[in-house]
Amino acid sequence: PGRGAAQLDAEVSVAGADGPGELVTMRLRGAMASHTASVALPLLIPDAPVVVWWASHAPKAPSQDPLGMLARRRITDASLAARSRAELQMHASQYAPGDTDLAWTRVTGWRALLAAALDRPHAPVVSAEISAVRSSPSAPLLAAWLHTSLGVPVSMHASRGPGITSVRLHTADGEISMTRRDGVKTLLSVPGYPTSEVSLRRRDTKDL
């Protein structure tokens, strides 16, 4: 963007695999890439909800970006950045209602599994730990959620991945653990119950 001759390539899809309605995909190059809001605005239907998703590099403050200002929901993906955790912290510092990062969406399965495990009778959780590849932006979000939900200290440890590989909750009766080594299956262990294998596949962006 911003280099070469100004160019606009567009593709229009009508009620197909992408869902009902019309989908317009535009690729802006050169100087035109600096005027995304001006290009998109004439295509918007008055009062219709607008969602902006930055499929690559996102602005520092999505809600203050000219294109982001047109949207009710702004979606970023910190995992695409070279320094993904720093990217997530930057977006958090500029957060505005309507901002969403896919790093949070990626922990939905973990949160559901943790909630199911904690639905069983158990001793109070006194601490927790998360293991994940060092660059994972989802791990600190899951840690913050656990800390807020349980009110206990949560430590993070580096692993070889992929992504988050384990969550352990420490109780007086033993350890509630969820371990995923291959990015697909997770072993769930709860004191007093047999260990079970649960599907917890790492989801592609298109599945989020």
Language-model segments: residues:
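A generic structural motif
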Residues: P1, W53-A55, D77-A81, P153-I164
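An N-terminal, globular interaction/scaffold subdomain
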Residues: P1-W53
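Short, aromatic/basic amphipathic alpha-helical patches
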Residues: Q7-S13, V39-A40, P62-M69, L142-W145
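Acidic, Ser/Thr-rich peripheral helices and adjacent loops at domain boundaries
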Residues: D9-V14, G68-A81, R168-D182
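Extended, compositionally simple fibrous regions characteristic of intermediate-filament-like scaffolds
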Residues: S13-A17, A81, P97-T105, P121, ...
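ATP/pyrophosphate-binding catalytic subdomain of soluble kinases
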Residues: L102-M156, G163-V167
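Long, compositionally biased intrinsically disordered terminal regions
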Residues: L150-G151, G163-T165, H170-L208
